[in-house]
């Protein structure tokens, strides 16, 4: 279930489309994505950059790391454990950081 603060359905559908295209999936009221990097160091550097952004947003992911892979789940505990606009915003920021890692 998605709980979007913005009531504009076109804007909500557009955001949903963007996340589908970036391969985020929704499962059990969570946005989920796995990232793969060249090696452990690159994966950990990515996690450090995400941690800074997440802390500034006061919205923190559930994540795991195994060697060069980072698995991330997002939902909003304060909204009852559902996906909200905060999750989409953090996912967008995470994708931006991942693309920066590609370059």
Swiss-Prot record:
Question: What's the EC number here?
Answer: 4.2.1.96
Which Pfam families does the UniProt entry name for this protein? Answer: Pterin_4a
Q: What class of enzyme is it?
A: lyase
Matches recorded under CDD domains: PCD_DCoH_subfamily_b
Q: Which InterPro entries match?
A: PCD_sf, Pterin_deHydtase
Which UniProt key words apply to this protein?
Answer: Lyase
Reaction(s) the record says it catalyses: (4aS,6R)-4a-hydroxy-L-erythro-5,6,7,8-tetrahydrobiopterin = (6R)-L-erythro-6,7-dihydrobiopterin + H2O
**Which GO molecular function terms does the record list?**
4-alpha-hydroxytetrahydrobiopterin dehydratase activity
Q: Does the keyword Lyase apply?
A: yes
Q: Which GO terms describe its biological process?
A: tetrahydrobiopterin biosynthetic process
- Which family does the record assign? Belongs to the pterin-4-alpha-carbinolamine dehydratase family.
Query: What is this protein called in UniProt?
Result: Putative pterin-4-alpha-carbinolamine dehydratase
Q: Which organism is it from?
A: Cytophaga hutchinsonii (strain ATCC 33406 / DSM 1761 / CIP 103989 / NBRC 15051 / NCIMB 9469 / D465)
């Amino acid at each position: 279930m998605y709980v979007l603060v913005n009531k504009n359905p076109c804007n909500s559908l557009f955001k949903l489309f963007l996340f589908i295209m970036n391969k985020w999936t929704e499962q059990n009221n969570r946005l989920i994505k796995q990232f793969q990097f060249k090696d452990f160091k690159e994966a950990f550097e990515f996690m450090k950059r995400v941690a800074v952004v997440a802390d500034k947003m006061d919205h923190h992911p559930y994540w795991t790391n195994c060697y060069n892979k980072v698995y991330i789940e997002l939902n909003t505990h304060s909204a009852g454990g559902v996906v909200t606009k905060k999750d989409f915003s953090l996912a967008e920021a995470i994708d931006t950081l991942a693309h920066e890692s590609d370059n």
